[in-house]
């Protein structure tokens, strides 16, 4: 799993992003969701989604009063599916922000929010956006002599076929 904490200054919004998530991380992510005061129905749906082990899924939850949100993207079957899932969940958050601040959902302000979010996420997830890079990074980290298999700083690498 890769965690990226993003602050969008213009809206004073904090976003915790979790990428390449597996069932192993369900409890940690549910704890974060409860901190944001997720309601019981959405908590059950989130738990079921996270615990399913399905590829190419995700979720987004925001607490407008706290100006905080969580984006979760599961492991992906391909780089294209990963990009699709990230943009899908980022779009949900941009839509929530548009509603919260009474912005035109098709307007520039919402597009800038989505762009800032992706710009902050990109350095941490760029290697997941290319199938060749995904396999290369996995191979290098697993087979390096000083590898701590899977954990590099804040990164916990997902398994790739």
Predicted regions and their residues:
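Short His-Asn-centered micro-motif
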Residues: 72-76, 96, 115
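Non-catalytic terminal regions of proteins
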Residues: 1-52, 158
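Alpha-helical hydrophobic/aromatic positions enriched in membrane-embedded helices and signal peptides
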Residues: 80-84, 100
């Amino acid at each position: 799993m890769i965690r990226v904490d993003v602050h969008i200054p213009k809206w004073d919004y904090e976003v915790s992003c979790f990428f390449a998530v597996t069932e192993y991380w369900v409890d940690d992510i549910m704890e974060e969701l409860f901190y944001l005061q997720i309601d019981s129905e959405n908590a059950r749906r989130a738990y079921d989604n996270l615990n399913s082990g399905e590829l190419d899924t995700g979720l987004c939850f925001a607490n407008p009063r706290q100006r905080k949100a969580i984006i979760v993207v599961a492991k992906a079957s391909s780089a294209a599916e990963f990009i699709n899932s990230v943009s899908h969940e980022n779009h949900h958050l941009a839509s929530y922000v548009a509603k919260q601040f009474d912005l035109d959902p098709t307007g520039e302000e919402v597009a800038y929010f989505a762009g800032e979010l992706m710009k902050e996420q990109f350095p941490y997830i760029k290697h997941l956006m290319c199938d060749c890079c995904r396999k290369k990074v996995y191979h290098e980290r697993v087979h390096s002599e000083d590898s701590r298999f899977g954990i590099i700083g804040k990164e916990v690498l997902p398994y790739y076929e």
